[in-house]
């Protein structure tokens, strides 16, 4: 809110209506002679703001505010301020929708004042709240700075300066709340002491006496209850025991009679069964004799089996040799490939070194040639100068010959420069002839280039559209090729799978879902397909197969419920054994036993389960099958481990021999054919490959269908793209064949040739300079020689010796480089030759590998054929053997069963005799017990309810009955003694006293809790006050120093705590003038002290800015330069607030944006704008 217009009518020296408009929103100054009414404008503003202290507006009563106290015909004083309220963020509460706010205060002679807001009458409190909401509280006017306030600040003590900071921070309110809380706490403490005294001196002694009496009464009640309970327990136990014995004997009698009847029937039935079984035995013996008289079919089948086994052994031996040859050749091939790769790398390295050495050798040779030429010329010169004839016998040597040669070279270089210059001139002339056509050609070419660009952009857009649709022609081709490869691979893998499937037929497990929502994941599968053997452990396959035995084809399921459902409703096609994970019990070999076994035979023993990989979910099944057997390398190790006293575990050798700690040994001759478990592993791997290939094939097929569908959708775009590509090709051809393009190309060629000529001229000019220098040098040497032949000749001889030495060194270097060059050349040729030889050898090895693979494939096919025949023969042989074994097994079973029946019959007869004797004894005991039970019922009525008796006995199970009888006697004696001493009314008396005690303790606890909360509140208030005070002090002292430095350059001031005290105990002003800190403000001049006070006031104003500030001649004690600094400070630092300043000094109002001048005319004040 900013002052926009001030209307004064009848207020103090303004007798008539005076309107002061065009107030600046930032800096306004009022000036004029003393007594002209300057300060009356400020008084009028304070009057409207609702000032209550008349002394502030220099009046003793409201009547003094009317012009000449109403004696000049003016009977009321009225002041109106119109505020600009366009800044909604700083608007008073409830006035955000008013762009202007008009506030009027009137005082009538002899009456009271009234207020109007926007022309409507309003109570004084509403006006005060309006201004307080925008920090214009006239009754605590921080925004009003009178001259006297500066003097007051100068004389403030540290505690008073701290009060200014507290006022700015707003922590006075915290002091009031703290004092209130301390008064409340004092009252609470008094009440607390009263309650504690009452509790200690009156209630607690009385309560202690009553509690002693209560304890005695409770003890009496407890004794009475224990006595009744103990007597009931003793009687219940006696009755229950007798009753239980009686019932037990009765049941025994009934069961004995039933059992006797059953035994008689069993003996009779068993005799009949034994007779029947003897007849069956005789019949089976006759059948066995008939089977033994048949021809020797088994012998023929065994001979045929041995022949097939020998053939398989021979073929596998051949295959093994072939495989070894193949592996050996493959290893050699790999070694050759590695050697070829290494040799190729070395050859590249040698060739690189050879090229570098060749380059160095040529450079050295060139330098050597130049050095020899220089030496030869020097030698000829010395010879000519010495003898008149050169070393070659020519008479035209010496300086003259060298000078002639140098001049010839100089002429040749000059001629070359002229030729290049002439060529460049001709090119420039041709360039001038092309230039007129170049502009038109460029323009025409730009059109062609633009056309090519447009065609290219069209093609790019069409390609982008195809990409958006996800269509890629090359992708379809790649997918089609991949689909063909996957199909071929799939058919071949399926063929291999079918072959292996015939060899492992028992792996098939098919079932129908027992019910629709059957959880298929609960059926884990056949054991043989649930684990894998790593290639490193494949040699253990026979041992692991022996370890698993028939369980290899068992089916693992999650629980017994799943197993039951499969057996009852799964429609299984063959008999299977199911392993439910929740029912099997495992006893795997412990880690300690395994460690001991490995220590006894290091590297030769391992737990079977550790040689396979499987899913964690079926760990229990794998432990059940493989967890209790050790795999050993050889029979010696197996014996050592199996029969060790601390191990005694089942062991299996790699050949499949089983060693049992009970002394059983099984094994011997086994098939030499490949292990069934290896076939199962191969079959499992191939099945996984088929699944992977099928998934890849499905993915490729889906992507192909997507691409075909996209191709149909984008046919139009593809046609447009082909057409655009054709247009682009035509446009490029047109661009290349266009004469304009040829002109531009020729222009570029000429510019390039001109550049080459310029470079050649520069190079030749450098050579020309060298030739000129050489001519000058020779001429200079000739002059020196003519003037002093002896000295010059000696100098030339020295140079010749030095050149000879350098030539010798360079020749040595040349020879060294040549030797290195030749060595590298030989090494490179040798490496190249070796590489060619190795490549030829590798080619031969690869041919051998292919040949061996074909031979191996043929052998494997033959082996598979023979193995198939072997399987057929073995099946027939097993069936024949099984028929004989079945007869023997059946005969043994019948004989065992007869023996078992005879034993059962004998045992039943003995049991029958004993039972008759016992029954007679039990009948005599029953009558005695019935008499005792009847006596107890008559004595204790509660025994009629046997359920109650049973519950009593159950609750006190395991007690010592004799101890309880003794305890019952002691309790009865104690009960009779206590009955004489107790007070039966004690419970009612103690209840009232305890309630009073509890109420007092609750009250004390509540008061202590309230006291603690008050203390916490005071502590929090002190912490918050200090934090707020420190932040305010830090901000104010910073602004204080900056403002003082602006007012008095090269100076600084700050607020600091008194020496040795905290910031909350008082603040004092420290001033630095130049580089010297002043000990006291007394050392400062009056103007400097005024600046200090004014800087502090301005810093406080800046901490919590108000929308308007009123300053009344605050610069009275300052010189002109300081006054000007204050004006500048207001203008630069307080941009968000409106200042109204009364000043007589030009330095102040020269900085103001608006200056009002007052003057006294005809007895009234008049205001004008400067």
Curated annotation (Swiss-Prot):
One of its GO terms (cellular component) is nucleus. Keywords: ATP-binding, Cell cycle, Cell division, Chromosome, Coiled coil, Cytoplasm, DNA condensation, Mitosis, Nucleotide-binding, Nucleus. Residues 523-641 form the SMC hinge domain. Residues 172-469, 678-1027 form a coiled coil. GO terms for biological process: cell division; chromosome condensation; mitotic chromosome condensation; mitotic sister chromatid segregation; negative regulation of meiotic DNA double-strand break formation; rDNA chromatin condensation; tRNA gene clustering. ATP binds at residues 32-39. The keyword Ribosomal protein does not apply. GO terms for molecular function: ATP binding; ATP hydrolysis activity; chromatin binding; DNA secondary structure binding; double-stranded DNA binding; minor groove of adenine-thymine-rich DNA binding. It is found in: Nucleus; Cytoplasm; Chromosome. It holds the Pfam family SMC_hinge. The keyword Cytoplasm applies. Its main location: nucleus. PANTHER family: STRUCTURAL MAINTENANCE OF CHROMOSOMES PROTEIN 3 (PTHR43977). Belongs to the SMC family. SMC2 subfamily. Present with 3290 molecules/cell in log phase SD medium. The flexible SMC hinge domain, which separates the large intramolecular coiled coil regions, allows the heterodimerization with SMC4, forming a V-shaped heterodimer. Forms a heterodimer with SMC4. Component of the condensin complex, which contains the SMC2 and SMC4 heterodimer, and three non SMC subunits that probably regulate the complex: BRN1, YCS4 and YCG1/YCS5. Central component of the condensin complex, a complex required for conversion of interphase chromatin into mitotic-like condense chromosomes. The condensin complex probably introduces positive supercoils into relaxed DNA in the presence of type I topoisomerases and converts nicked DNA into positive knotted forms in the presence of type II topoisomerases. This is Structural maintenance of chromosomes protein 2. The lineage of its organism: Eukaryota, Fungi, Dikarya, Ascomycota, Saccharomycotina.
